[in-house]
Curated annotation (Swiss-Prot):
<feature type="region of interest" description="Fusion peptide">
    <location>
        <begin position="528"/>
        <end position="548"/>
    </location>
</feature>
<feature type="glycosylation site" description="N-linked (GlcNAc...) asparagine; by host">
    <location>
        <position position="379"/>
    </location>
</feature>
<feature type="coiled-coil region">
    <location>
        <begin position="636"/>
        <end position="668"/>
    </location>
</feature>
<feature type="region of interest" description="V4">
    <location>
        <begin position="404"/>
        <end position="434"/>
    </location>
</feature>
<keyword id="KW-1133">Transmembrane helix</keyword>
<feature type="glycosylation site" description="N-linked (GlcNAc...) asparagine; by host">
    <location>
        <position position="462"/>
    </location>
</feature>
<feature type="glycosylation site" description="N-linked (GlcNAc...) asparagine; by host">
    <location>
        <position position="286"/>
    </location>
</feature>
<dbReference type="GO" id="GO:0039663">
    <property type="term" value="P:membrane fusion involved in viral entry into host cell"/>
</dbReference>
<keyword id="KW-0261">Viral envelope protein</keyword>
<dbReference type="InterPro" id="IPR000328">
    <property type="entry name" value="GP41-like"/>
</dbReference>
<feature type="glycosylation site" description="N-linked (GlcNAc...) asparagine; by host">
    <location>
        <position position="318"/>
    </location>
</feature>
<keyword id="KW-0165">Cleavage on pair of basic residues</keyword>
<feature type="glycosylation site" description="N-linked (GlcNAc...) asparagine; by host">
    <location>
        <position position="204"/>
    </location>
</feature>
<feature type="glycosylation site" description="N-linked (GlcNAc...) asparagine; by host">
    <location>
        <position position="214"/>
    </location>
</feature>
<feature type="disulfide bond">
    <location>
        <begin position="44"/>
        <end position="57"/>
    </location>
</feature>
<feature type="site" description="Cleavage; by host furin">
    <location>
        <begin position="527"/>
        <end position="528"/>
    </location>
</feature>
<feature type="glycosylation site" description="N-linked (GlcNAc...) asparagine; by host">
    <location>
        <position position="37"/>
    </location>
</feature>
Length: 881
């Protein structure tokens, strides 16, 4: 039993020590390389110095390097705030640049347009009608018409199959600047911008209306602006970063991308607005790859730049544009034309057939594709029906929007059999005809149309085709259709789909054994911290938590220095452009970016201050770690992985840290209050005397309450003895009540309680006995407390005495064992010391003797060698004698 008791005692002691020294406490780290997804606005930077680039974006210095991270991150091109912002912002650029501000509703009137039988789309000049031959059915041709830079028809705009632009001259009457008088106006329209009714057979005029009058709001550009593409990049505000998946196998969605780089800005991109094709993209490589939507058949196909695919468009004719003031605030841009201009057209250069063949092969190899593997059954098709932007290939050429009919091009690329097609489509050509619209459907807002003024001069534009927008459909492995799409937004998912915006979260929480922050005695390094830039501290994102924690001071300083540096740069360019940015949508975004950066830094510092950890890189707290089974692997886990593990605990830990800090502040307040008593002068302060009076009142009230309680107890005791006092008056007014005892009754020998006195009278001397009674009750209470405490202490001593004796005996035995072991160690050390000394002496003597013998041997050998010539000389002398 004794041994068992000793073991139990030792176990209790060990558990107590473990409970004290092995408890994990929450530790706050500032400057850890961790992040979370963000959705804040980005700002743009561009090198364009034209009107748009100056008013919409900040200057671009081109100094945006990338830093590789040893982490794994998920990327999605469709569920991506960067691409969504690009889609919205490019539309805002488009809308801001043309500044549509005048509604053309007054032009929704009946117009008399020349539409004769001889000239279906006629223009009149001095009662003279310019006519063209009516088109006839062309024979089926298997010839392939090809053009290139040296073709003569390019310069003369007379390539086979191209016609004149379909335009209509109209007249209309409306009130002008003088509201009480009407005026007749002449206007030239593109035929696709009007809707005409069938006129009388004898009348050369038709009733026409401006298109879209009944379906949407039409606005005209206030100033003569044109939509020209610009190149720009997105940049993250200070405190945020852009991650990019650098894996060549990335196809628009990858939950675990292991090749991640970080930067503060994206690559350059172009404000593309086109359907079917993407032009002048920055993602073209020496391979074909596909971004495929995760839940449907939408794709964006990046074409191999090896094939040098180009598209060159031209709008022939030297147009002039004249502003016509129809009424106050409405300036219409007219095209005074005498002849119908040549039709706009585009021709395609490069190895298109090889490129489309590689596209089909890439589709077959894609893991999402389950259709036929026979590329001959994979066809490139045009979408049917819908808006003209869908049916035609819609693109922008220096401010003019072209709608190109792509049948010739598809016949040429696919080598189709054209015998079953309509007469005008029975051709295989590498160029296509286009028509121009001034009233266009906006590609981002449904039900809104914009009137774009015509562009002056002869327009030519050259573009590099870098991608295809398509929907890929297949049925049971028989046929697969690559249907060209009008999803303009897909272009920006290809350009920026490998980026994701993250918010740097430099505050990390982890458990450690230290309960409170203590400063060590080691000296500080006098060398300055090398600032790597804002993203420099993210270089440790792939390092283990322990290794990254050793560099928290440098990382936090780098983070702060980077934020301040970015803010200064951003503020500088904003100040230089504040006049230009004041009234623009993107100017507001740029200013909002700076505000976001300041809010980010202040939010982190406020959070640290709420926990009592302001301006500390490592802050130990008194809050126990809430989940003892969840601890970090400091040698293997990264801070990003650890943040994901403890994300569900963050809210609880934050609340506990705030409560601990509030309690700490209360404790400090109480401690400061106690410190005021050590000054003698504070004892005579007026506020202190008010407290003294308050305490005195409390004492008086307590005495009164005690007297009332004692009175009630005494009355209850009297009632239990059968005595009932008169309650009509208080005890202080009781007089001695004399009662005459009947002499016939026998006298009682004893008393019960405080019964009557001997004799015939009994009285209750309340005022005299009350003080004695109070004293007796207090004495009894103190006696009872003393006896109970003495009994409790004696019993505790009796219980603890054997335990203490056993503990003393155990400690004594441990001391004896330690003393014995120490004696053994001392004896062994002395024996070892003597042995070493004896060995050293023996070795010294042996070496000295050996060295003496060796030296004597060498000396004799040397003398013998030196004596050889002398012996030879002596022998020769004896011989000669």
């Amino acid at each position: 039993m004794g041994c068992l008791g000793n073991q139990l005692l030792i176990a209790i002691l060990l558990l107590s020590v473990y409970g004290i020294y092995c408890t994990q406490y929450v530790t706050v780290f500032y400057g850890v390389p961790a992040w979370r997804n963000a959705t804040i606005p980005l700002f743009c930077a561009t090198k364009n110095r034209d009107t748009w680039g100056t008013t919409q974006c900040l200057p671009d210095n081109g100094d945006y390097s990338e830093l590789a991270l040893n982490v794994t991150e998920s990327f999605d091109a469709w569920e991506n705030t960067v691409t969504e912002q690009a889609i919205e912002d490019v539309w805002q650029l488009f809308e801001t640049s043309i500044k549509p501000c005048v509604k053309l509703s007054p032009l929704c009137i009946t117009m008399r347009c020349n539409k004769s039988e001889t000239d279906r789309w006629g223009l009149t000049k001095s009662s003279t009608t310019i006519t063209t031959a009516a088109p006839t059915s062309a024979p089926v041709s298997e010839k392939i018409d090809m053009v290139n830079e040296t073709s003569s028809c390019i310069a003369q705009n007379n390539c086979t199959g191209l016609e004149q632009e379909q335009m209509i001259s109209c007249k209309f009457t409306m009130t002008g600047l003088k509201r009480d008088k009407t005026k007749e106006y002449n206007e030239t329209w593109y035929s696709t911008d009007l809707v005409c009714e069938q006129g009388n057979s004898t009348d050369n005029e038709s009733r026409c209306y401006m298109n879209h009058c009944n379906t949407s709001v039409i606005q005209e550009s206030c100033d003569k602006h044109y939509w020209d593409t610009i190149r720009f990049r997105y940049c993250a505000p200070p405190g945020y970063a852009l991650l990019r998946c650098n894996d060549t196998n990335y196809s628009g969605f990858m939950p675990k991308c292991s090749k991640v780089v970080v930067s503060s800005c994206t690559r350059m991109m172009e404000t593309q607005t086109s359907t079917w094709f993407g032009f002048n993209g920055t993602r073209a490589e020496n391979r074909t790859y596909i971004y495929w939507h995760g839940r449907d058949n939408r794709t964006i196909i990046s074409l191999n730049k090896y094939y040098n695919l180009t598209m060159k468009c031209r709008r022939p004719g030297n147009k002039t544009v004249l502003p016509v003031t129809i009424m106050s605030g409405l300036v219409f841009h007219s095209q005074p034309l005498t002849d119908r201009p040549k039709q706009a057209w585009c021709w395609f250069g490069g190895k298109w057939k090889d490129a489309i063949k590689e596209v089909k092969q890439t589709i077959v190899k894609h893991p999402r594709y389950t259709g036929t593997n026979n590329t001959d059954k994979i066809n490139l098709t045009a979408p049917g029906g819908g808006d003209p932007e869908v049916t035609f290939m819609w693109t922008n050429c220096r401010g003019e929007f072209l709608y190109c009919k792509m049948n010739w091009f598809l016949n040429w690329v696919e080598d189709r059999d054209v015998t079953t097609q309509r007469p005008k489509e029975r051709h295989r050509r590498n160029y296509v005809p286009c028509h121009i619209r001034q009233i266009i459907n906006t590609w981002h807002k449904v039900g809104k149309n914009v009137y774009l003024p015509p562009r002056e001069g002869d327009l030519t534009c050259n573009s590099t085709v870098t991608s295809l927008i398509a929907n890929i459909d297949w049925t049971d492995g028989n046929q697969t259709s690559i249907t060209m799409s009008a999803e303009v937004a897909e272009l920006y998912r290809l350009e920026l789909g490998d980026y994701k915006l993250v918010e740097i979260t430099p505050i990390g929480l982890a458990p450690t054994d230290v309960k409170r922050y203590t400063t060590g005695g080691t000296s500080r390094n006098k060398r300055g911290v090398f600032v790597l830039g804002f993203l420099g501290f993210l270089a440790t994102a792939g390092s283990a938590m322990g290794a990254a924690s050793f560099r928290l001071t440098a990382q936090s300083r780098t983070l702060l220095a980077g934020i301040v540096q970015q803010q200064q740069q951003l503020l500088g360019v904003v100040k230089r452009q504040q006049e230009l940015l004041r009234l623009t949508v993107w100017g507001t975004k740029n200013l909002q970016t700076r505000v976001t950066a300041i809010e980010k830094y202040l939010e982190d510092q406020a959070q640290l201050n709420a926990w009592g950890c302001a301006f500390r890189q490592v802050c130990h707290t008194t809050v126990p770690w809430p989940n003892a089974s969840l601890t970090p692997d400091w040698n293997n886990d990264t801070w990003q992985e650890w943040e994901r593990k403890v994300d569900f605990l963050e809210e609880n830990i934050t609340a506990l840290l705030e409560e601990a800090q509030i309690q700490q502040e209360k404790n400090m307040y109480e401690l400061q209050k106690l410190n005021s008593w050590d000054v003698f002068g504070n004892w005579f302060d007026l506020a202190s005397w008010i407290k003294y009076i308050q305490y005195g009142i409390y004492v008086v009230v307590g005495v009164i309450l005690l007297r009332i309680v004692i009175y009630i107890v005494q009355m209850l005791a009297k009632l239990r003895q059968g005595y009932r006092p008169v309650f009509s008056s208080p005890p202080s007014y009781f007089q001695x009540t004399h009662t005459q005892q009947d002499p016939a009754l026998p006298t009682r020998e004893g008393k019960e309680g405080d019964g009557g006195e001997g004799g015939g009278n009994s009285s209750w001397p309340w005022q005299i006995e009350y003080i004695h009674f109070l004293i007796r009750q207090l004495i009894r209470l103190l006696t009872w407390l003393f006896s109970n405490c003495r009994t409790l202490l004696s019993r505790a001593y009796q219980i603890l005495q054997p335990i203490l004796q056993r503990l003393s005996a155990t400690l004594r035995r441990i001391r004896e064992v330690l003393r014995t072991e120490l004696t053994y160690l001392q004896y062994g050390w002395s024996y070892f010391h003597e042995a070493v000394q004896a060995g050293w002496r023996s070795a010294t003597e042996t070496l000295a003797g050996a060295w003496g013998d060796l030296w004597e041997t060498l000396r004799r050998g040397g003398r013998w060698i030196l004596a050889i010539p002398r012996r030879i000389r002596q022998g020769l002398e004896l011989t000669l004698l």
